[in-house]
C-alpha cells in the first residue's frame, strides 16, 4: 500500500488465525493512543489479538525510527486496521452420516504510526526531490511543442521550395538554349547571304 504522506510508518501482518470480529475488539482500544500507552493497554488485555498487535506495533516503531528518523516518544497510532482474510473450510462428522461445516477464519492486520512533530525535515527532503523531478513547467512544455511543430513544418516546405527552384532552373536553361539556337541560325543566314553576294559579284 503506497501512502502519499511520508510522515507515516506502516507495518502489516497477513493471514493470522483469528476472526476479524474478535481482533477489532482490540483494535478499537489503540487508535489515537501513544505507542507507550498502547503497549501498556495490550499488556493488560487478555485477548488473542493482543500479542499480535504488540508484535505489529514494535515492528512499526522500528520502521519509523530506522526509515524516517522519528523519535519513539513522539509516535502515535493513527490507525489499527483489521481486514478479513481467506477462510479455511473444515467439516465435523455428525449423527447418521451427516457432517457440519467449520469455518476457520483469518485476518490481515495493519498499524499506521504518525509523529507528533510532523517530520518537518522529511517533508523538506520530499519537496526537494519533487522539485528535482519537475523539469519543465506547462509554459515551457507549450513553447517546446510549438517549436517542435515549427521544426516539423520546415522540412515539409523545403521540398516544395526545392521543386520550385528546379523548375525555374529548367525554364531558364530552356530559354537560354532557345536563344543560342536563334543566334546560331542568324549567323548561318548571314554566312549564306555573304556567300551568295560574292557569287553574284564574280558572275
Curated annotation (Swiss-Prot):
Biased composition (Polar residues): 138-167, 183-196
Region Disordered: start-end pairs: 138-203
Bias-annotated ranges (Low complexity): 168-177
Record GO terms (molecular function): rRNA binding; structural constituent of ribosome
InterPro entries the record matches: Ribosomal_uL22, Ribosomal_uL22_bac/chlpt-type, Ribosomal_uL22_bac/org-type, Ribosomal_uL22_sf
A GO biological-process term: translation
Keywords linked to the UniProt accession: Ribonucleoprotein, Ribosomal protein, RNA-binding, rRNA-binding
Superkingdom of origin organism: Bacteria
GO cellular component: cytosolic large ribosomal subunit
NCBIfam families linked to this entry: rplV_bact
Family classification: Belongs to the universal ribosomal protein uL22 family.
Subunit and interaction comment: Part of the 50S ribosomal subunit.
Functional description taken from the UniProt entry: This protein binds specifically to 23S rRNA; its binding is stimulated by other ribosomal proteins, e.g. L4, L17, and L20. It is important during the early stages of 50S assembly. It makes multiple contacts with different domains of the 23S rRNA in the assembled 50S subunit and ribosome.
Protein name per its UniProtKB record: Large ribosomal subunit protein uL22
